[in-house]
Every structure is written in structure tokens, then in C-alpha cells.
């Protein structure tokens, strides 16, 4: 059985972003139940030199939408990184899910061999589609997703593995 690039990318991003919305909703509810402004969560960090929750959500969104676009051979939409509230961050994740829904499975046919170029600060990374997805897109996506999860958990939100995985 051949597994499609669409199933390996779109379906994984969609499920995980849906779970991200779930844990963010639990974060907001937890803050309200403890009588503090949920937007405090947006600025939280695990360590002083780490990116805040807001940036973790923005990067999770970016890796999903940009990776799908690169695999499809199209330009990704540009999202301004101007979110400051939990409500705005939830809206961004929803907008990312909406975008993923516009990329048809047919656009990713043959993308395992597509040349992908990723501009970095000091160089351009060049990979074929499948190694790009396996070794760049998914690991980076999950790094930022799990960091967002950990920030909520660290701040007392009652979430666990089932919330993260969606089972």
C-alpha cells in the first residue's frame, strides 16, 4: 500500500491543529476558572531565552501552511505575526486549518520528488519533498506544537496525552 504525501502532511497537520485548538480552549477555560486573564498565557515562556507561547502558535501555524504550500509548489499565504491575545491566536489556527482545506490532494501528487528550497538566515536548505516533510516540516511543526502544549501544562492547565493526540 502506498501512502500519499497528502495523508502524511495535510491529515497530520489538520488533526494536530484541531487538537491545538482543543488545548488552547482548555487553557482559556482554566484561566477563567482561576480568575486570571487568559491573555497572560500568550506571553508565557518555559525559559527566559525561549520564544513565548504566542510565537510557538505562530510557528506551528507557519510550518503547517508553508509546508503544504511548498509541497504543492505554490506560494504560501502570508500571515502577519501580530496576534497578542488568545482569541487572536485561536483565530490564526482556525485560519491555518481553513487554508489547509484549500490545498487539494492532487496538488501533492508526485511531491515526494519535488525540489524544495527553504530560505534560512545564513543559507538556503534544499531537499526533495519526502525528506523535507520527514526531516524538516513535521519535526519543526511538532517541536512548536509540543512546546505550546508544555507551556499550557506548565501553567496548570489540566491537559494530558489524550488532549495532545486526540484519542
For the regions a language model picked out, list residue spans one by one.
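Helix-adjacent hinge/juxtasegments
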Residues: 65-103
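Acidic interhelical loop/turn segments
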Residues: 31-42, 102-133, 165
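Long, well-ordered alpha-helical segments
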Residues: 20-34, 148, 152
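Short, highly charged C-terminal tails/helix-capping segments
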Residues: 159-167
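Short, contiguous alpha-helical
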Residues: 43-76, 124-159
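Aromatic-residue-lined binding/catalytic grooves and analogous aromatic/hydrophobic interfacial grooves
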Residues: 3-26, 39, 46-67, 94
Amino acid at each position: 500500500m502506498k501512502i500519499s504525501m497528502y495523508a502524511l502532511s495535510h491529515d497530520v497537520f489538520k488533526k494536530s491543529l484541531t487538537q491545538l485548538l482543543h488545548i488552547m480552549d482548555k487553557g482559556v477555560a482554566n484561566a477563567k476558572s482561576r480568575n486570571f486573564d487568559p491573555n497572560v498565557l500568550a506571553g508565557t515562556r518555559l525559559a527566559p531565552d525561549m520564544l513565548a507561547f504566542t510565537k510557538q502558535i505562530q510557528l506551528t501555524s507557519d510550518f503547517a501552511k508553508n509546508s503544504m504550500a511548498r509541497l504543492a509548489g505554490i506560494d504560501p499565504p502570508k500571515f502577519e505575526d501580530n496576534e497578542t491575545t488568545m482569541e487572536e491566536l485561536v483565530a490564526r489556527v482556525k485560519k491555518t486549518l481553513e487554508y489547509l482545506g484549500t490545498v487539494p490532494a492532487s496538488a501533492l501528487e508526485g511531491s515526494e520528488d519535488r525540489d524544495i528550497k527553504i530560505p534560512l538566515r545564513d543559507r538556503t536548505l534544499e531537499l526533495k519533498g519526502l525528506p523535507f516533510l520527514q526531516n524538516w516540516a513535521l519535526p519543526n511543526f511538532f517541536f512548536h506544537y509540543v512546546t505550546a502544549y508544555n507551556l499550557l501544562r506548565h501553567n496548570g492547565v489540566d491537559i494530558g496525552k489524550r488532549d495532545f493526540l486526540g484519542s
